[in-house]
């Protein structure tokens, strides 16, 4: 994950000081891209330990179409707690938009089901897209989508994915997002009888919070380790039937975790 460290270093050394919604303050650049060949290892940060349980359960929760944190809480995942209301509700966020995008005539579109079917039936389509950025429902969301839009691409029997992330918390958020969408790409590739190609991460406002500077310096001082490989233990009937125990990262070694506050 040298690419990630190069990205972090670039923003830390060359970013512009900016204010932000949370009042924390950031150092930021606009526009950055990283490309990861998923055949060279699973792109998980090794210069600090990631909570893989949270990454996997969050993705499974998105795929359920859920907007309530109960599933996450039941599985020991707390990453959405700060934004949920007293009943655990978050409004029409990622999972709802992925699985039940509302139409003007009262129907709902399951974007995940549709994109998987399109990949199978028309892999050369340039419309293999899922969007969470529903302008009409943003006011009802506790947190508007940071990773807002993703597109698939099939070539030479391999599935690639590109994510556009409008707001990128480089220290805390981006490592989760890279791993999550790489995992989703592997899952959909398996469901569509394809190999994996590249995961392309594209960021808009790419920032380091001012209260993460010390942690960033620590992380930049560490040498990355060899990437692990992802093992999916079996193929379920659909993209929605994967379970936490279906996934194993083989050979994952990392430096110790680095704690940092979340800007809410």
UniProtKB/Swiss-Prot annotation:
One of its GO terms (cellular component) is cytosol. Catalyzes the reductive methylation of 2'-deoxyuridine-5'-monophosphate (dUMP) to 2'-deoxythymidine-5'-monophosphate (dTMP) while utilizing 5,10-methylenetetrahydrofolate (mTHF) as the methyl donor and reductant in the reaction, yielding dihydrofolate (DHF) as a by-product. This enzymatic reaction provides an intracellular de novo source of dTMP, an essential precursor for DNA biosynthesis. The active site is at 146 (nucleophile). GO terms for biological process: dTMP biosynthetic process; dTTP biosynthetic process; methylation. Coiled coil: none annotated. (6R)-5,10-methylene-5,6,7,8-tetrahydrofolate binds at residues 51, 169, 263. GO terms for molecular function: thymidylate synthase activity. InterPro entries: Thymidate_synth/dCMP_Mease, Thymidate_synth/dCMP_Mease_dom, Thymidate_synth/dCMP_Mease_sf, Thymidylate_synthase, Thymidylate_synthase_AS. The lineage of its organism: Bacteria, Pseudomonadati, Pseudomonadota, Betaproteobacteria, Burkholderiales. It is found in: Cytoplasm. Its EC number is 2.1.1.45. The keyword Oxidoreductase does not apply. DUMP binds at residues 21, 126-127, 166-169, 177, 207-209. This is Thymidylate synthase. Pathway: Pyrimidine metabolism; dTTP biosynthesis. CDD domains: TS_Pyrimidine_HMase.
């Amino acid at each position: 994950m040298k690419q990630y460290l190069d990205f972090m270093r670039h923003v830390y050394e060359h970013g512009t000081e900016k204010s932000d919604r949370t009042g924390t303050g950031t150092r930021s650049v606009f526009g950055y891209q990283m490309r990861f060949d998923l055949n060279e290892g699973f792109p998980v940060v090794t210069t600090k330990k990631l909570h893989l349980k949270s990454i996997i359960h969050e993705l499974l929760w998105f795929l359920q179409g859920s907007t309530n944190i109960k599933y996450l809480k039941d599985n020991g995942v707390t990453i959405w707690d700060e934004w949920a209301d007293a009943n655990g509700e978050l409004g029409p966020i990622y999972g709802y938009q992925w699985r039940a995008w509302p139409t003007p005539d009262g129907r709902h579109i399951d974007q995940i089901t549709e994109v998987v079917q399109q990949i199978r039936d028309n892999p050369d389509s340039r419309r293999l897209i899922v969007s969470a950025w529903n302008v009409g429902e943003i006011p009802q969301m506790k947190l508007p989508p940071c990773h807002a839009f993703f597109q698939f691409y099939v070539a030479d029997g391999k599935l690639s994915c590109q994510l556009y992330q409008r707001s990128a918390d480089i220290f805390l958020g981006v490592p989760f997002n890279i791993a999550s969408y790489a995992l989703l790409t592997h899952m959909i590739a398996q469901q569509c009888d394809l190999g994996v190609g590249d995961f392309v991460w594209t960021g808009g406002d790419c920032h380091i919070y001012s209260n993460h500077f010390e942690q960033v310096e620590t992380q930049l001082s560490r040498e990355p380790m060899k990437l692990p490989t992802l093992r999916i233990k079996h193929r379920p009937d659909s993209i929605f039937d994967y379970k936490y125990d279906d996934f194993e990262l083989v050979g994952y070694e990392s430096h110790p975790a680095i704690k940092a506050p979340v800007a809410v």
